[in-house]
Amino acid sequence: MNYTLLNDFSQIDSNEWNTLLKESIQDTPFLRYEYQKTWWEHKGGGEWKDAKLLLITAHENNQLIGIAPLFIAEYENEPAILLNGSIEISDYLDVIVKKDDHAKFISGLLDFLASSFGDTWSKLDWYNLPDDSPTLLALKEEANKRGWMHREEVYRPTPRIALNGSFEDYLSRIEKKQRHEIRRKMRRAAESELNVKFNLIGQDADIEKEINTFFELMIQDPNKAEFLHPAMREQMTSVLHEAYKNNYLWLGFLEIDGVKTAASLNFDYQNKLWGYNSGVSQAHRDLSPGWVLLAHTIQWCCDNNRYEFDFMRGDEDYKYRFGGVNRFVMRSQIKK
């Protein structure tokens, strides 16, 4: 394999990137070209101040074999190489390479990083690797082979709901008390005189207006309001516009008495829904708008044959009450 360092995302074709991603070990919204490029332009909404892009490609017989979207920055008082998208807003990260090429790609990548940038970094620190990623074992084996220190730990749970039938099938598989609670809240909302409606934003929407409405609901939560500082809002707005343009943004609202009262922001990608964020107004709390909207979201998944709802990172109680089962993302470190 021939490895090349690129200085900018403009040096690689977006279609070539996304085509390889479709056959890669992981195909997630966070690894698509437009997401990775947008994340880098905003440095994670200001998460990283001083960072240098290390966008590395590998070719074999003039064919693109692998992509390692990386950057180098001072982290925990050491110069570290991280996956582009680290850490806070990209739930799943990895290298982009087919399974059959993966082991030799990782081995060659570490050789390239050691020979080309050996004096500029002291560790690899890769967050948000899915727990079934072959990259985890490959990094461990390569570190052992080189006599480097290796450490791996669980970083965050990522609860998921497996879906393979109707909404009633889904309800029948969750705990009885929660099943009754979901049904009761949905029925109460449906019978309300306030005309409760679930609406999904279409491709003809005024997307800027809808995104701003979502943000207005999101910041009703004080913690989310603190998170959504101006640089992060700019970052997320750009990401959502790209997802909308590429037809995988899923934005649903619950309207009560003609007013959008709860919002569910997801990525509809690879036949599953990836639950990215949400927002709920303080109005009409008696109708449980957040719960009712989540139930409608899962019902939409069932009606449209999505095989999974992925809550992504976080161990909030409601995820398990709706039937989420833990998977995890990992942190893998290598020190020379």
What are these regions (language model features)?
Residues 59, 73-154, 270-322, 326:
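Acyl-donor binding region in acyl/amide transferases
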Residues 328-330:
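C-terminal end-helix/capping segment
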